[in-house]
Amino acid sequence: HVRVSFPEQVGNFKEEEVLMSTIYVWIIAMFVISIIIAVVRPMIKGKVGEAAVSLLLKQLASDKYKIVNDVILSSEGGNTSTTQIDHIVVSVYGIFSIETKNYKGWICGTENAKQWTQSIYGHKYKFMNPIHQNYAHVKALESMLRSNGYEAVPIYSIIAFPGDTTLKVTANKARVVKWGAVVDTVKNLSDTVCLSDDDVEKITMKLMDREAEKTQLREHINEIHEVKV
């Protein structure tokens, strides 16, 4: 007698189909996760760097230096675009615009180059010249100051990298230093009084108002999203 086992074969086929579907789902999930990590990781690294420099800046005397972090200003020219500044230090000696980078390895670049190079673990990566990036921040600050009646206030550009970075950079218009040298750099540039204590308070409040506006905008956007959901 011949025994027919079609039901068993069909069952095996379905099990294989389910297994393959599961494998495909896992592959797609891992692909999506890898994309998310690739996008989010630089953001996390950037925020870690900003937090480290923000903590170091607290070493500055609070009666002489006012610190405002993560400020969004309108770009120069009064258009609708904006620019985000990691740290602004306001003092009677002028204003310091600090751009924080969390890139390790060897950093090579010049003041006028469009891109700089990071060399690490035998690989080279290009990134935007942070001096150019901070120049846009300086111009935005100048525009904001002019609109509030402040002319010719010195604004110093500082670019900060981690302590274990090797810097091979030539620059005159900006100070390119390591995180641990940021405070001393600010102090070394603090040689001529150009603003009154009252001016420092007013400018700081203007920057903090911008921060409050940014927070309100984020809350408003979140509320809109919640309504849509």
Predicted region positions:
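Short, Lys/Arg-enriched N-terminal segments with co-localized hydrophobic residues
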Residues: 1-19
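Surface-exposed interaction regions that form or flank ligand-binding interfaces
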Residues: 13-83, 90-95, 104-106, 115, ...
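Acidic/histidine-enriched active-site and ligand-binding environments that engage anionic O-linkages
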Residues: 108-110
